[in-house]
Amino acid sequence: MRIDILTLFPGMFSGVLSESILKKAQEKGAVDIRLIDFREFADNKHKTVDDYPYGGGAGMVLKPQPIFDAVEHVTAGSPGARIILLCPQGERYTQKKAEELAKETHLVLICGHYEGYDERIRQYLATDEISIGDYILTGGELGAMVIVDSVVRLLPGVLGNEASPVDDSFSSGLLEYPQYTRPADFRGMKVPDILLSGNHQLIAEWREKESLRRTFLRRPDLLDEYPLTDKQKQWLKEWEKERE
């Protein structure tokens, strides 16, 4: 996979891309991540990328020309690239979206700044608009980091344990079950006996139940569209009674 990040502040990414999973993924050749300062594509003497909004109003708006030219440059020979605007008006980012993007071969992430984008960028250039949450950030860089991390870890061969991304919270549609490691008894706080039993069938059922319980207690909204089994429906009824 290739990921191009269009930003006015490429230095913000140096630490993120040179550590942990993202560093290893690049070293393995699983992903090619490139930083593009789209100010370099401005066609004016002072390399200005923003201007006052027509009709008046507060703030400055990103001009279409530098972004159009930068995108056309990085997508030359790659007509199927996904062009993604990071903006608060976009679709709420989810694990499902990460899994969708992980199937692509070329992503272009555009990090906004100032008051926003010229609308023609949205209308005629972007294929997607994504928001990472209902809050305002200084720019799209942090959102781009979130997308890159969540997508790259899903690429084949990036994580050591191929089951790891599948077991993560949200991948199954539910929150992840509780995890424990050594020691089995820490200051009187003990690991559940069933996890020490060696009975894989019982452990699998415990994890399924605890995953559902945690989702029920913390994110019940995730259950609205989750395909519950009869057994899981029975568990939910029991927990509902306990709360009455």
UniProtKB/Swiss-Prot annotation:
Gene Ontology annotations for the cellular component aspect, listed alphabetically: cytosol
Pfam family, one: tRNA_m1G_MT
Catalytic function, reaction form: guanosine(37) in tRNA + S-adenosyl-L-methionine = N(1)-methylguanosine(37) in tRNA + S-adenosyl-L-homocysteine + H(+)
Record organism: Geobacillus kaustophilus (strain HTA426)
This protein's record includes keyword GTP-binding: no
Subunit note: Homodimer.
Bilayer-crossing regions: none
Protein name, per record: tRNA (guanine-N(1)-)-methyltransferase
